[in-house]
Amino acid sequence: KRAVPKSKPVCYVENEVPAAGVLAHHLEQGTLGEAPIWTDLRTFAAEPWRGVVDCVIGGYPCQPFSIAGKRLGKSDPRHLWPFIERIVETTEPAYCFFENVPLHLRDGFDEVAGSLHGMGFEVAAGLFAAAEVGAPHERERLFILAAHTERARSTGLGKGDTSSIFGGWEWRGAEDVQSILDAPFERGNRWPQPLLRGMDDGLAHRYERLQIVGNGVVPQQAAYALHVLSTALEL
């Protein structure tokens, strides 16, 4: 919505149960456009969506390429690009917008870019950090925008202005730190959680929530990436 105000989702696909729960919560709260949720990208039936979808958006698993994983690349069973490729080829969108970790440039990006070129897309990609839009942390990510050489001309991206991309951050300074130090701390209280990732490591039952926070992308960051890459493609 920040980047393309008139856009609306027609379906979601999310395999991880905790992440799907967060997605369902936002649908209930009305912070995301209402649409059905599918659970398995590998078996997702794309045929009914042919000609219905203008843009395929995805953050396919980063574990095959992330420095935090074993970096097995295409041999990792979580490598889902071939299934996304099938969906793109079947639905015939005008645009594709993807996100992944920076190391994807070294391993796997050539396959993705070559596949998109083979399907008739022009591709622009770049590294963008959340700090570029004012966030108090780096969170660098690779964003990929693909525009079909024929379909993109007739559809149009419908970009909004950049006013909603920058700003909107709640900064905390010395007064906030001092208020934490001055606050009484009694037995049984939890220590304040960190600003940068929103929560502490905690116990094992809190792992899934921390994982979701770590995998997240700052909305302004994605909107800024879309704006820059679409300008590079002269959209």
Regions found by a protein language model. Give the residues of each.
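Short, hydrophobic alpha-helical segments
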Residues: 226-234
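Short, contiguous clusters of charged residues that form electrostatic/catalytic patches at enzyme active sites
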Residues: 21, 39, 79-86, 220, ...
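SAM cofactor-binding core of SAM-dependent methyltransferases
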Residues: 1-42
